[in-house]
Amino acid sequence: MKYIAKKCGVRFQPPAVILIYENETEGKSRQRIMPVRNFSKFSDCTRAAEQLKNNPRHKSYLEQVPLKQLEKLFVFLRGSLQGQSLAETMEQIRRETTIDPEEDLNKLDDKELAKRKSIMDELFEKNQKRKDDPTFVYDVEVEFPQDEQLLSCSWDTASVDDF
């Protein structure tokens, strides 16, 4: 039986993931409540999302729901268990899913660095121009204004004696 996922959300009390789906054969919209058990404010959201998605009872319903979306729902649930407001949790998710250009990636541990690299890879794939794109131009020439004053950098102004 094939199910088409329409909406996916989270219920905080008692904790559950709620899926509104359409049965392909009948065409009726239905709601499935998947309780979240043994989840605390210290739980790993990625692991919990994978377990729910691979659960044999819910697997056929969650085929079309991306794992990232389930992870995000579990982050909302964990934030609620930690006592954070919805706005605070959304701000935390925004900080974790965006790259700060001023952040020193050398100071991050391996797990955080891998997360940042995966975010960069996703952004690269999303913004990459391919040959078959309608807006693709092979040889782009860019004119830079010559009348503006050039900004110097500290390594540009270093003396030659330092070398």
UniProtKB/Swiss-Prot annotation:
Keywords: Cell projection, Cilium, Cilium biogenesis/degradation, Cytoplasm, Cytoskeleton, Obesity. It holds the Pfam family CEP19. The keyword Ribonucleoprotein does not apply. GO terms for cellular component: centriole; centrosome; ciliary basal body; cytosol; nucleoplasm; spindle pole. It comes from Mus musculus (Mouse). Its main location: cytoplasm. The lineage of its organism: Eukaryota, Metazoa, Chordata, Craniata, Vertebrata. The keyword Metal-binding does not apply. Belongs to the CEP19 family. It comes from the Eukaryota. This is Centrosomal protein of 19 kDa.
